[in-house]
Curated annotation (Swiss-Prot):
Organism: Anaeromyxobacter dehalogenans (strain 2CP-C)
Broad class of where this protein is predominantly found: cytoplasm
Alphabetical UniProt keywords: Amino-acid biosynthesis, Arginine biosynthesis, Cytoplasm, Lyase
Annotated compartments: Cytoplasm
Entry GO terms, CC: cytosol
Similarity comment text for this entry: Belongs to the lyase 1 family. Argininosuccinate lyase subfamily.
EC number: 4.3.2.1
Gene3D superfamilies named in the record: Fumarase/aspartase (C-terminal domain), Fumarase/aspartase (Central domain), Fumarase/aspartase (N-terminal domain)
Catalytic activity: 2-(N(omega)-L-arginino)succinate = fumarate + L-arginine
One annotated GO biological process: L-arginine biosynthetic process
GO molecular function: argininosuccinate lyase activity
Protein name: Argininosuccinate lyase
The protein's enzyme class: lyase
Length: 467
């Protein structure tokens, strides 16, 4: 594109002279919104086609504009468009290059449209696409977790509360917890997409236009569900952007949780898992190191995602109706957030899908019964003892076990009976982890049948998603 910094920007038609270079430097946004070129061109093609159908623009001119915009899109994609700060934003860059290709016909394009409703459409189109990309990445992540869960139905490990051993669960149940989280994330992205998929074009700067536009036709051409209903709101609404970044932030928080577990589980102290070499890094100094950078970066990226959300909300706070230039600053958090999530999700999917989980070490970590103390309390409850009384009795047994230096599973039947008269010899059966799991078959529980039911449910759900 031929740069022409002396040409007066279209927004200065009523102003004398040129803008001060300091204002130009502050105002330029092409370095950020240039990433929206595909959405901007797509919206322009739908808009000019509608203008022609409504008799506002000659059909031949509209056809030339649509064809030329295809060329502009290709030039952007190939990196052949040189950004000119004097042209400020992506809209002006597209229109200027269009003018070089079709001459005065380019002047038809902006009829009935403002950059205010134009950029609102660009962002909505971006959000719809971003939701689809995030959903696809999260589905890939779910499949990675589901594959490992299916392979580890019989692997038992301690479940943790407060990072202290609590009760036994299967590794499949543990991994399915993340499948659930990512399922909720996908639902959120679907909701964001649904609300974003309406067209603001026709809202103009803030009060529509006197031209007989067909707003619904533009929405239909773009594959959107309908149109916005208030022009003031439409040009200043960034709710969908905020919702998208919230969905990204919460998904990133979920990724940070598995990231933390990958870091912990791959330590010698835990020894629950080993990352494949393809998803580990070394040290520039210590040749023996195998570092879980993928988990650490997942934790770190969550901080960035939270920052993007807070940055956008701070920009929106206190803005009067309708459009304000503050909204130019929404591009950096909006455009970077979804792509960072996709990148992180794919890396974590690869790390989890290729990791080795050490079943023997996990089962060793259950210890000799402490994680099954609740089963002993419920043993009494099944015999008519109030739970608080049962809880106190087992607590005394746990304290005695610690003082004696003997695991609870090694206490004698007589010792158990000393803590409560309803304890009998068969209380020792409570300290069999596999038996314990088999007795936990409520829906959503870690029992083998319950876990298999959840595996089948998710396999069916993801199978439908693939089709």
């Amino acid at each position: 594109m031929r740069a022409n910094s002396k040409a007066k920007p279209v927004s200065r038609a009523a102003l004398a002279g040129e803008a001060d270079p300091r204002l130009v430097a502050l105002s330029v946004s092409i370095q950020d919104d240039g990433a929206l070129y595909a959405e901007d061109i797509r919206g322009s093609q739908a808009h000019v086609s509608m203008l022609a159908a409504q008799g506002i623009v000659p059909k031949a001119a509209a056809r030339r504009i649509v064809a030329a915009l295809d060329q502009v899109r290709a030039e952007f994609a190939a990196g052949r468009i040189r950004f000119d700060p004097a042209l400020e934003d992506v809209h002006t860059h597209v229109e200027r290059r269009l003018g070089e290709l079709v001459g005065k016909d380019a002047g038809y394009l902006h009829a009935g449209r403002s950059r205010n409703d134009q950029v609102a459409l660009d962002e909505r189109l971006f959000i719809v696409g971003a939701c689809d990309r995030c959903d696809a990445a999260l589905e890939r992540l779910q499949r990675a977790f589901l594959g490992q869960a299916r392979a580890h139905e019989r692997t038992i490990l301690p479940g943790y509360t407060h990072l202290q051993r609590a009760q036994p669960v299967s590794l499949a149940h543990h991994l399915l917890a993340y499948v659930e989280m990512f399922g909720r994330d996908r639902e959120r992205f679907a909701e964001v997409r649904r609300r974003a998929a309406v067209s603001p074009l026709g809202s103009g700067a803030l009060a529509g236009t006197t031209l007989p536009l067909d707003r619904e036709a533009v929405a239909a051409r773009l594959g959107l569900a309908g149109v916005t209903h208030n022009s003031l709101d439409a040009v200043s609404d960034r709710d969908s952007a905020a919702e998208l970044l919230f969905a990204c932030a919460l998904a990133a928080v979920h990724l940070s949780r598995i990231g933390e577990e990958l870091v912990l589980w791959t330590t010698k102290e835990f020894g629950f898992a080993t990352l494949s070499d393809a998803f580990a890094t070394g040290s520039s100094l210590m040749p023996q190191k195998k570092n879980p950078d993928v988990g650490e970066l997942a934790r770190g990226r969550a901080g960035r995602a939270l920052g993007d959300l807070v940055a956008l909300l701070a920009i929106l706070k206190g803005l009067p109706l309708s459009y304000n230039r503050d909204l130019q600053e929404d591009k950096r958090p909006l455009l970077g957030g979804p792509e960072a999530l996709v990148l992180t999700a794919d890396a974590v999917a690869g790390a989890v899908g290729t990791a080795t989980f050490h079943a023997e070490r996990m089962e060793e970590a259950l210890g000799s019964g402490e994680a099954l103390a609740t089963d002993a309390a419920e043993y009494l409850v099944e015999r008519g003892v109030p739970f608080r009384e049962a809880h106190e009795a087992v607590g005394k047994a746990a304290a005695f076990s610690a003082r004696e230096g003997r695991p609870m599973a090694r206490l004698t039947a007589a010792e158990w009976a000393s803590f409560h008269r309803r304890f009998e010899k068969d209380v020792l059966r409570c300290f069999d982890a596999r038996r314990s799991l088999k007795r936990r078959e409520l829906p959503g529980a870690p029992g083998p049948r319950a876990v298999r039911a959840e595996l089948r449910r998710w396999e069916k759900a993801l199978g439908k998603a693939r089709r």
